[in-house]
Design a protein with these regions (language model features):
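HotDog/MaoC-like acyl-thioester-processing domains
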Residues: 2-26, 107-116, 120-167
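Hot-dog-fold acyl-thioester-processing enzymes
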Residues: 2-100, 163-167
């Protein structure tokens, strides 16, 4: 997250670093500094772990001869997981109770081997939990870009987040 040093008014954080519900500011855009260059080994491992034999992800010869891309595409669910994972250190490590769902998930441009992913998260909503007084629901809009700033993935996600413990 690109923020100048911590101020006296910085929101309280969990000992592991995540923001409590009260620290999420609707409208704030977090630009995550953590990046990741993806590899074909990432693609192979993920595809094998998820039992996905799609040649579009794992077969260079097939992709070179039979696709418009000419090379394997990174598995879109790997891309989705990476995008959300990159946000965790800055925002939710130690404070997420559960993911409640994702909507409007899109992959407008393919991600390829050796692309470097960087991400942003915009806080687009939050509300108190009706059933749990120690938590709230935060809505996040995650976006992932490649090294050329082409949008490769986005989704809106609702997360169940802990409130700051009472002293």
């Amino acid at each position: 997250m690109k923020e100048a040093g911590m101020s006296m008014n910085a929101p309280a954080r969990h000992k592991r670093g995540g923001l409590y519900f009260e620290g999420f500011e609707v409208g704030k855009l977090h630009e995550h500094t953590l990046t990741r260059t993806v590899t074909q080994m990432d693609n192979m491992l993920f595809s094998n772990m998820t039992l996905n034999p799609q040649p579009l992800h794992i077969d260079r010869e097939f992709c070179a001869k039979e696709t418009e891309w000419g090379q394997p595409l990174m598995n879109s669910l790997f891309t989705l997981g990476l995008m959300i994972g990159i946000s965790v250190t800055d925002l939710t490590v130690g404070t997420t109770i559960a993911n409640l769902g994702m909507v409007d998930t899109k992959f407008p441009h393919p991600l390829f081997e050796n692309d470097t992913v960087h991400c942003t998260t915009e806080i687009i909503g939050k509300r108190e939990s009706k059933s749990r007084p120690n938590a709230g629901i935060v809505e996040l809009h995650h976006r992932a870009y490649n090294q050329d700033n082409k949008l490769v993935a986005e989704c809106r996600r609702q997360a169940f987040i802990l409130k700051q413990p009472k002293a």
